[in-house]
């Protein structure tokens, strides 16, 4: 986190001789872009039509046609380590996520407790004035901290995300998920016979983007959309 700036005003014995420091809201660079980061669970990049695979993905293809495709990269092929590396920009062992949270132990690099000094991209953008959100699978909270009683320091809302809606652990039913809205447990499938988690996540993300656009049109947003398998 940023250090608290020194007081730049003046404090005199009397109010009339004192000068308050001007408080400024975080500002973003002019024309800062909105950012949508999509993370898909348990899928290889070669599955998509964009890379010659059998799964038709016209949306991704449209993005690729107007952007870049990469085919050389490193992945851990595991949930928590990949997510930790993606969100912090650091090698997964250096942020204590050598394995999934369910197999955490006390050896260095494996306790599944991302240190405070390893800021997430959401925290950096949040401090820079962005609105931030996470929809979907998190799987970065130590397993003993995943209950509704917290602590919430390593939940999305404690790691730079203003808004969280999804599942906190490794997996959940797509039809009857044990989900969370911020840190409150919910059962979104109740009285909804056609409920499906991925569709719900997409609707929630779109609604959040629309609310943000209307209420804070001058602030860009960062949305981390991470569907579970």
Spans of features found by a protein language model:
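Formylglycine-dependent sulfatase
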Residues: 1-229
């Amino acid at each position: 986190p940023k250090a608290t700036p020194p007081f730049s005003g003046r404090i005199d014995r009397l109010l009339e001789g004192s000068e308050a420091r001007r408080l400024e809201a975080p500002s973003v660079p002019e024309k800062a872009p909105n950012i949508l980061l999509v993370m898909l669970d348990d899928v290889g990049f070669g599955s998509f039509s964009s890379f010659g695979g059998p799964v038709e993905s016209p949306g991704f293809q449209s993005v690729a046609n107007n952007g870049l495709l990469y085919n050389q990269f490193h992945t851990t092929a595991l949930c928590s380590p990949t997510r930790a590396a993606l969100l912090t920009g650091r090698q997964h062992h250096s942020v204590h996520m050598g394995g999934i949270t369910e197999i955490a132990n006390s050896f260095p690099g494996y306790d599944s407790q991302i240190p405070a000094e390893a800021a997430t991209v959401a925290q950096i953008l949040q401090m820079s004035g962005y609105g931030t959100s996470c929809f979907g699978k998190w799987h970065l909270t130590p397993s003993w901290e995943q209950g509704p009683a917290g602590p919430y320091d390593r939940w999305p809302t404690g790691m730079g995300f203003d808004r969280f809606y999804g599942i906190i652990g490794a997996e959940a039913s797509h039809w009857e998920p044990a989900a969370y809205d911020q840190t409150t447990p919910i059962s979104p499938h109740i009285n909804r016979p056609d409920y499906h988690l991925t569709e719900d996540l997409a609707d929630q993300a779109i609604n959040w983007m629309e609310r943000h656009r209307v209420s804070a049109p001058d602030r860009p947003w960062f949305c981390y959309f991470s569907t579970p398998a």
